[in-house]
UniProtKB/Swiss-Prot annotation:
Transmembrane segments: none annotated. Part of the 30S ribosomal subunit. Contacts proteins S5 and S12. Belongs to the universal ribosomal protein uS8 family. The keyword Coiled coil does not apply. Pfam families: Ribosomal_S8. This is Small ribosomal subunit protein uS8. Keywords: Ribonucleoprotein, Ribosomal protein, RNA-binding, rRNA-binding. The gene is rpsH. PANTHER family: 40S RIBOSOMAL PROTEIN S15A (PTHR11758). It comes from Anaplasma phagocytophilum (strain HZ). GO terms for molecular function: rRNA binding; structural constituent of ribosome. SUPFAM superfamilies: Ribosomal protein S8.
C-alpha cells in the first residue's frame, strides 16, 4: 500500500488508538516517524516505542505504547499542520505557539526534527509538521 502522507497516517493511527483506549498501536517504520516518536516520549505524550519485524515478509513496524492518565488519553489533540498539498514553513522569530504554549509544535529544520521551543532557541526555522496538546 502506497501512502502519500505517512506522517498523517501515523497521527491518525495514534488518534484512533487513543480514542479506542488501546494500549498498543502499530505504525509503519520511517526515520521521520521515529524522530517524532522520540519527541513525544521525551515530552511525556506516549510511554515508549519499539521497532519490530512483522511476519515472514520482514516489514519493519513501530510498536507504540500509548499513555493514559485516569483513563483519559495523554494526547488531547494532535493535528497535522504542513501537508503535501499545502506546506507550512516558519522562521524562528515568527514561530507560532500551539495553544498558547500549552502544547507543542514539532518542526523539521535543517538541524533535524525538534520542538518549536528548541528551534526558536537555536534560531532556525523550518516546516511545521504537527501540533500536539
Amino acid at each position: 500500500m502506497s501512502l502519500s502522507d505517512p506522517i498523517a497516517d501515523f497521527l491518525t493511527r495514534l488518534r484512533n488508538g487513543q480514542a479506542g483506549m488501546n494500549k498498543v498501536v502499530y505504525v509503519p517504520c520511517s526515520k521521520v516517524v521515529m524522530a517524532v516518536l522520540r519527541i513525544l516520549v521525551e515530552e511525556g505524550y506516549i510511554e515508549s516505542f519499539t521497532e519490530e519485524v512483522r511476519g515472514d515478509s520482514g516489514i519493519k513496524v513501530l510498536k507504540v505504547f500509548l499513555k493514559y492518565f485516569n483513563s483519559a488519553a495523554a494526547i488531547r489533540k494532535i493535528v497535522r499542520v504542513s501537508r503535501p498539498g499545502k506546506r507550512v514553513y516558519s522562521s524562528a522569530d515568527k514561530m507560532p505557539r500551539f495553544y498558547n504554549a500549552l502544547g507543542i509544535y514539532i518542526v523539521s529544520t535543517s538541524k533535524g526534527i525538534m520542538l518549536d521551543s528548541h528551534a526558536r532557541n537555536a534560531g532556525v526555522g523550518g516546516e511545521i509538521l504537527c501540533g500536539v496538546f
